Amino acid sequence: MMSALFCDATHELDAIGLRCPEPVMMVRKKVRLMADGETLLVSADDPSTTRDIPSFCRFMDHTLVASETEQAPYRYLIRKGQ
C-alpha cells in the first residue's frame, strides 16, 4: 500500500527496469528542472537504488522525505533542497 505522502508528489519518475547508474542519473536530471520545495516520486526496481538514492540526496543537499524499500518496486519521495 502506498503511503499518502507518495500521493502528493509534484513530479513522478518511473525508473523500473533501469539499472545503475541510470536511475540516479535520471533523478539528477529531473530534480535539476524542479523548483526548490517541489517533490519527486521515484519508482525503481534496481536494488542499488536503496543505497544510491539516499546517498544522492545527502550529497546534493536534497531531502529524502520517505522511502519504501522492503520489496520492489521501491519508492522514494525526494524534496528538492532542504
Curated annotation (Swiss-Prot):
Main location: cytoplasm
Source domain of life: Bacteria
GO cellular component terms attached to this protein's record: cytoplasm
GO MF annotation list: sulfur carrier activity
Record keywords, A-Z: Cytoplasm
Localisation per UniProt entry: Cytoplasm
Transmembrane region(s): none
One Pfam family recorded for the sequence: TusA
Single GO biological process annotation from the record: tRNA wobble position uridine thiolation
Active site: 20
Family, as annotated: Belongs to the sulfur carrier protein TusA family.
NCBIfam families named in the record: PRK00299.1 (NF001423)
Role description: Sulfur carrier protein which probably makes part of a sulfur-relay system.
Name of protein: Sulfur carrier protein TusA
Origin species: Aeromonas hydrophila subsp. hydrophila (strain ATCC 7966 / DSM 30187 / BCRC 13018 / CCUG 14551 / JCM 1027 / KCTC 2358 / NCIMB 9240 / NCTC 8049)
Organism taxonomic ancestry: Bacteria, Pseudomonadati, Pseudomonadota, Gammaproteobacteria, Aeromonadales
